[in-house]
Amino acid sequence: IIRAETIESMRILGVPKETIIYKDLPNVLLNDIPMHTVIKVVHDVIESVQPDVLYVPFMYDLHKDHREVLYAAQVAARTCTPTGRKIKEIYMYETLSETHWNVDHTEGGFLPNVFNNIEDYIEKKVEAVQAYKSQLKTYPDVRCVEAIRALALFRGSVMGMEHAEAFVLVRLLQ
């Protein structure tokens, strides 16, 4: 179901289906397989795609898979490797259903320092998120359209714009 929803969401955003990369890793069970396997999968994707910019989950997301993916990406993107040196920017993003459910006083809270203006894209973002029918809930659940709009509105208001997405800068090589 998730794969079909991803394809539909990416179609809405204008991402060609053939550019979507899937790997057969267990959902919600990444910590059940050896970390070196996850690192290799992430490294191979990075090496294949050769991105300049990498977006990764927030380090203290409650979802363990998010933490595993972040760790694997950090290892794969180390600047001591040719593959890692090609990545000039790394940003951690917030996930409504995971980032703010951690225990802020024992782990760091999400304190963004980069904001992208999405005033022209908020409706497209909402439409793309709505493609994930199996994941979307109704208000007041955090996985609802109203929460997505509210977060974009809040992040935008912090920077004096209508809507924004917020990130934590991890790396900026200039």
Regions from the PLM with identified roles:
Residues 1-86, 92, 135, 150-151, ...:
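Active-site beta-strand->loop->alpha-helix modules in alpha/beta enzyme cores, enriched
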Residues 5-17, 86-174:
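The feature marks non-catalytic terminal segments
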